[in-house]
Structures are given as C-alpha cells and as structure tokens.
A protein has these predicted regions:
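Short beta-strand
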Residues: 88-91, 197-203, 244-248
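C-terminal accessory nucleic-acid interaction domains of nucleic acid-metabolism proteins
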Residues: 1-61, 65-67, 78, 82-83, ...
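Beta-sheet entry/capping signal
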Residues: 45, 85-87, 98, 196, ...
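Signature for HUH/AEP ssDNA processing cores
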Residues: 129-202, 213-221
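A contiguous, low-structure linker/loop signature
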Residues: 97-151
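A short beta-strand motif that forms the metal-chelation/ATP-contact edge
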Residues: 208-214, 255-259
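Short N-terminal amphipathic alpha-helices
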Residues: 77-92, 98-100
Length: 333
C-alpha cells in the first residue's frame, strides 16, 4: 500500500431511510420485573432481551441495570458518539465472561440504524453501526456491549480525527499515583504548546488525556505529533515515563504514554463507558484539580456516577464542540 493510500480510506455514510420523529422521548425507565421488553420511540422500536441476566453476579447488577445506566446518561454521552463508526465489544455472558469484537453491523438489524461503510485494505468494506440517538444506543447495548468504542474521526472523513490523545497505562511495578503524576506531566507539556487538554479515567487502570483539534491533519500526522510529544516526555522523565511500545523492551515501574492509540482504526473506551471490571467502574471525566488532589479508579462506578453527572454536567462538553479547538497544522512537518 502506498503512503497516499494509507492516508485516504473511502467511507460512505448511509443514513437510515426511515426518518426519526424529533419528538421521540429522550428518557426511558425499564421495569425491574421485565425480562424481555419492546420500547417505542416514535417510529423506532427497540427490543430488549434477557434483562434479568446477571452481568456482575457479585454486585447483583443485571443487563437491565446496564441498559438503564446508558439510558440515564444518554444526554451527555450521545454528542461524543454521533456520526462515528462504532466497534462493538460484546459480552454475551456478562463482565467476567468471554467477549468478542464485532465491526460489521449485525444483520438483520432495525432499518433506522445508520451505517458507516469504511474501506479497509484490499478493498474490504466494513459496515460499522453508528449510534445517533437513544434508540440506537439501547440497541447496541442490548447486543451485550458493556463499553463503547467509537472512532476518533467522523464518518464523513475517517482519515481526519477530531482529537489527539494519550493513553496513560501503568507498566507492572507502577502505581495509579504514578499515573496521576504522569497525567500532570502530560498536561504541562501540551499546555506549554498552548493545547487545551481534558482528562478522564479509563475505568480500568489508567487515564486518558484528549486534545480537541481542528479537523484537517490526517490520522498518521496526528499520530506522529503524539509520538514526538511522548518521546520528549519520556526523555525528560526517565524514572517515571516510558514511550517504548514493545512490551518486551518496556522498562518496569514506569507509566506508558501510549501514543500508538492514535493510529488509524484504533479505538479507546468512550467517555461514560462502563468497563467490564469487578466493580463496574466507569470511564469518567475528571478535573485537573481532582487529579492533583488524588483520585481512585474505583471512585467512579455504575452505581454512583449518575449523581456526579447530574451535579457537574458534561465536563467533556468542549470535546464535542466546534469552538476552541487547537490548530495542529503549524506543527506538521
């Protein structure tokens, strides 16, 4: 494949022919007594199945509870998913069960599900589902998806992302306190370049830091800049940070500033995603003041983050806005 081809992947946004009713409800309450249920949103019907199945048996959290959570946070979540291809990670037997990745939207499927058809290598076209509204969100979660993994670029130009980001992941021997220290170092580095940046817990072991950028540079160009920043951080903080991607060569007791997640076609768990962890933790936006004071991954769980969202709103709202995005073009070589 030539470099030019790598930087251009044809995509086609197939919007559903069936029009949605603008007045469709944006909230839903699922009865705890129901095991199977069909919800109607205007002219969209969503079938929910196996609602009583325990997805976290130790916590007594059911599939119904998971779907209800996503319904409750949909107003802050949906702007971050809209118009983006979704990679499905399905857990049919709950958080501790086996899972599998699924890119192709299953068929048959509701006629109102939008599709992002992306050409990969050798002309292979993958028809990804797109979560545009509450019904499509509930449909995807009902398939057994616990967390959500959307593309960094919107479907109308899948080669040009809206973000530059870093995945901070502790190498064995490093602590979460080391991750928080690394997050502050990343913040200092990107803010020295006048880049705005926002943090969230991964809900697993680390922290994600995102920089909203003006769409224009290709995914490869964004990856290159992220790599340069990560390498500088590692050289300036050798006892704390590593940017070595190969596991066998990676020094222990460091925090990996993973720039490689900026590669084309990669995804990270979205903001507000529940993670398949023993405590049903959530990838939640956090303030820099909270990072400075100290937080724990387990502070943010399916059972308690709704109160936080109600109080603080969407701390990541700027990531979904067209305003105050960083112009990366001057940094391209």
């Amino acid at each position: 494949m030539t470099k030019a081809h790598r930087d251009y992947h044809p995509a086609h946004f197939r919007r559903a022919e069936q029009r949605r009713l603008k007045a469709a409800p944006q909230t839903v309450k699922i009865p705890r007594s129901a095991d199977h249920l069909e919800l109607e949103f205007g002219n969209q019907q969503v079938k929910l199945t196996n609602l009583k199945k325990l997805f976290w048996p130790e916590l007594k959290i059911t599939k119904r509870d998971l779907i209800q959570y996503y319904a409750d946070v949909s107003s802050v979540l949906l702007p971050h998913l809209k118009d983006r291809a979704m990679v499905m990670k399905r857990y049919p037997n709950g958080a501790a069960g086996d899972f599998f990745f699924m890119k192709q939207a299953p068929s048959p499927r509701p006629s109102w599900i939008d599709i992002c058809a992306i050409e990969h290598g050798s002309g292979n076209i993958v028809n990804f589902p797109v979560i545009q509204d509450l019904p499509s969100l509930l449909w995807v979660i009902n398939l057994g998806c616990i967390d959500l993994n959307q593309w960094y670029a919107r479907c109308d130009d899948v080669d040009r992302p809206d973000y530059l980001h870093f995945d901070l992941d502790p190498v064995p021997g490093a602590t979460f306190e080391n991750v928080l220290e690394t997050a502050l170092a990343v913040r200092e580095a990107v803010e020295s370049l006048k880049m705005p940046c926002y943090a969230k817990t991964t809900g697993s072991k680390g922290v994600h830091i995102y920089v909203p950028i003006v769409r224009g540079p290709t995914q490869k160009q964004v990856w290159t800049i992220a790599k340069e920043i990560a390498l500088v951080l590692a050289s300036e903080n050798p006892g704390l940070i590593t940017a070595v991607y190969k596991v066998a060569k990676r020094p222990k007791g460091r925090v990996l500033v993973d720039y490689n997640q900026n590669a084309w076609g990669r995804t990270l768990a979205s903001v507000y995603s529940v993670r398949p962890t023993p405590k049903a933790t959530v990838s939640i936006p956090v303030t820099w003041e909270e990072i400075e004071k100290g937080i724990r991954i387990d502070d943010f769980r399916l059972d308690n983050v709704r109160k936080r969202i109600k109080k603080l709103g969407d701390l990541w709202k700027p990531l979904a806005s067209e305003r105050k995005r960083f112009q990366l073009e001057p940094y391209l070589k």
